[in-house]
Amino acid sequence: MRVNVQRWTLYVLLLMSGARGNQQNEASIVEDQNKKEDNVNLESASISAHPEIAPASEPIQYKTAEIADAMQATDIPTNPAVLLSMVPREVMDLKVSESESSVCDSTIEEAECSAYEHLNEPADAQDKGNSETPERDTEQAKAEESNNTDSSKPLKVNCEERNITGISNFTVNILNITQDLMEFLNPNSSECTLVLFYTPWCRFSAGLAPHFNTLPRAFPTLHFLALDASQHSSLSTRFGTVAVPNILLFQGAKPMARFNHTDRKLEALKSFIFNQSGIEAVPGVVVTEDDCESPLPCAPTVGIDWLLVFSVIYVTIFIVYATMQTESIRWLIPGQEHEHQE
């Protein structure tokens, strides 16, 4: 029993001595690390203060493998002084001279410094700046051209102004069902005529009527015609009139332009004529109450649409006939089946 106790006490003493030895080793390692760090910090401070006297790069040697492992561990950040020591002295001197030449006092010599930096720019940057200047000028010129009105564009129609001497009443001529458009258009002349395709029962044509009635007074040197598209269906098909109201500008007997704007007011019509022909409107011409009366009506006319009546009658007759023939159709189908069986 005593022998066992002595053995256990011996084991405990050995363990305690080993632990003390490990603690002493660890303390010595920590002290060595602190000394190394202090030395490195002093070296980095001296190098940062005097970069021209930085020592040559030398490999760092450690006393023991444990200290080397501790210093080269991944959790310890790399010391910048060590990295600086690896840079050659010629490169350091060049960087220092460049930094000193580029440093400028912004509070005292700000203007002079900016001029100096501009002079020190490379030739490529100056060439780029010079090349960007004409590009900006061209972009500004394009923007100004796009902002100009259509009046600066070349005229599409060169209208010959008609002689208005002796004419006091300028109005719209309306074609009846017996007249032809070509009777009013002269193919051998360069005079321009504005032709309106309309229908009396269309409310859009009625809304345009007072503004179109005002145009002959605003443009006395032009001709103005209006025709009922339902009565002149051949002309509507010939000139591509699929909806009314439709306005075409003719030069002689040739259609030159079509009015496609949704705003069918007097100002829009004036702009259309001016942009196409270059003829300016007479100033001071406005829509009056008389323009709502004639020659084009300002209210849609109420009448009988005989085409619609004929269509309704035709559909009704077809339905009655199909109903009466239902029984005969039923008898035909079984007869055909018997023929196939025989």
Swiss-Prot record:
<feature type="glycosylation site" description="N-linked (GlcNAc...) asparagine">
    <location>
        <position position="176"/>
    </location>
</feature>
<feature type="topological domain" description="Extracellular">
    <location>
        <begin position="22"/>
        <end position="301"/>
    </location>
</feature>
<dbReference type="InterPro" id="IPR036249">
    <property type="entry name" value="Thioredoxin-like_sf"/>
</dbReference>
<keyword id="KW-1133">Transmembrane helix</keyword>
<feature type="topological domain" description="Cytoplasmic">
    <location>
        <begin position="323"/>
        <end position="342"/>
    </location>
</feature>
<keyword id="KW-0970">Cilium biogenesis/degradation</keyword>
<protein>
    <recommendedName>
        <fullName>Thioredoxin domain-containing protein 15</fullName>
    </recommendedName>
</protein>
<feature type="region of interest" description="Disordered">
    <location>
        <begin position="120"/>
        <end position="156"/>
    </location>
</feature>
<keyword id="KW-1003">Cell membrane</keyword>
<keyword id="KW-0325">Glycoprotein</keyword>
<dbReference type="GO" id="GO:0060170">
    <property type="term" value="C:ciliary membrane"/>
</dbReference>
<comment type="function">
    <text>Acts as a positive regulator of ciliary hedgehog signaling. Required for cilia biogenesis.</text>
</comment>
<keyword id="KW-0732">Signal</keyword>
<feature type="compositionally biased region" description="Basic and acidic residues">
    <location>
        <begin position="120"/>
        <end position="145"/>
    </location>
</feature>
<feature type="signal peptide">
    <location>
        <begin position="1"/>
        <end position="21"/>
    </location>
</feature>
<dbReference type="Pfam" id="PF00085">
    <property type="entry name" value="Thioredoxin"/>
</dbReference>
<feature type="domain" description="Thioredoxin">
    <location>
        <begin position="173"/>
        <end position="276"/>
    </location>
</feature>
<keyword id="KW-0812">Transmembrane</keyword>
<keyword id="KW-0472">Membrane</keyword>
<feature type="glycosylation site" description="N-linked (GlcNAc...) asparagine">
    <location>
        <position position="169"/>
    </location>
</feature>
<dbReference type="InterPro" id="IPR042418">
    <property type="entry name" value="TXNDC15"/>
</dbReference>
<dbReference type="GO" id="GO:0045880">
    <property type="term" value="P:positive regulation of smoothened signaling pathway"/>
</dbReference>
<feature type="transmembrane region" description="Helical">
    <location>
        <begin position="302"/>
        <end position="322"/>
    </location>
</feature>
<dbReference type="GO" id="GO:0060271">
    <property type="term" value="P:cilium assembly"/>
</dbReference>
<dbReference type="GO" id="GO:0005929">
    <property type="term" value="C:cilium"/>
</dbReference>
<dbReference type="InterPro" id="IPR013766">
    <property type="entry name" value="Thioredoxin_domain"/>
</dbReference>
<keyword id="KW-0966">Cell projection</keyword>
<feature type="glycosylation site" description="N-linked (GlcNAc...) asparagine">
    <location>
        <position position="188"/>
    </location>
</feature>
